[in-house]
Amino acid sequence: TGIRDLPPALPMILLAWLYILAVFGFVKQAAHRWFPQASAAAYLLTAAGAASGTQIYYLLHRPSVYEYAILCGATFVLWALWQWLCAANTPVNRRKALTFHLVFGSLCMALVAGCRPQMVLFAALALPILWPRYITEKRLCTRRGAGEAAAFILPVVLVAVGLMWYNAARFGSPFDFGANYNLTSNDMTRRGFAVGRIAPAAVNFLAGIPGVQTVFPYLTATRMQTNYMGLTITELYYGGAFACLPLLWGLAALPLARRRLGSRRDLRTVIRLVLVCTVALAVVDCQMAGMLYRYQSDWLGPLLLAAALAWLFAESVLQARPIPALTKALRTALPLAVLAGVCYNFCVYFAAEPQLMGQNPALYENVSRLVQ
């Protein structure tokens, strides 16, 4: 934090709560926009699943400056998406509230560049969120719409000018964020781009299988295996997103209702953009730095929100065309998917390094006795 009496752990706890608040706020606004008939149970379960499946608990387990920057970036991304969705849902006659949401959302997304620059890729989601009002309805061509567009852009410009001035003063270029100057295990300036790194990293990020054992905490770390002849930076890994978080499996059902999804182009575009950004960030991370478990935080939050939208969409489809067997399956699968994500992150928290067995053996042993 740069403040002697404010270690990273304290603001990280606050950021974690803000992250969870943004998840629930986003899902609520998404339900208001696309799923007005969504049940309270579906809203609470999807929001709880997106909040509990995230890596914020793992980051809190390692409260260093590096994890602090990652959590800042992830929190700002979700707040930006939430505020933009609030702006899209705010009636145009409430100009002050509408302008506030636009400005605050853009400010949050602009601040991401100062924390975790690659996460700014999710700013592309502003297009499908705001497109219907400002392009389809041609509000951008009006005087008030132009003013709102200026309010949307102004925070980005101001933060960009400040960051570019800082980068130029410290690193000699307005576009150099200093990532290559990390004192780490390898020369960041000579990593380059190697196609051979992509497939192993992407598979592990998205579908890696964690190690399992029969005693608490039931998960063990694994290491990425690769035939790539160059250097690949890796750390202990605890499983890929799609392999360990069943909430994400809801995305697989979207092609089954592609016609209904096609009638909601903005929703379809939001989900597709999240998937594209997820793959892009997985590739960027493995090329820029390596295959590290905490790098899932760069894209896992928006991906879980997309999965929440998929589950809400499934419920809306079954409300419009009830099929008792599928409705029952949905009502059973969604709580189980959320519970599985909670259990997975619970196990990771006690299995991950630095292990609580050494840091807080009393807590570890008490929980172990309660669970086993």
Describe the residue ranges of each PLM region.
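Juxtamembrane segments of multi-pass membrane glycosylation machinery
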Residues: T1-L14, H32-Q37, L59-P63, T226-Y237
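Transmembrane-helix signature of polytopic, membrane-embedded enzymes
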Residues: V23-Q55, T75, P91-F100, L267, ...
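Specific aromatic-rich, kink-prone transmembrane helix
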Residues: L71-V92, L107-M109, A123-A126, P302-L309
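Short hydrophobic alpha-helices at membrane interfaces in multi-pass membrane enzymes
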Residues: C86-A110, R143-G147, A151
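Hydrophobic, aromatic-rich transmembrane alpha-helices
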Residues: T226-R268, A307
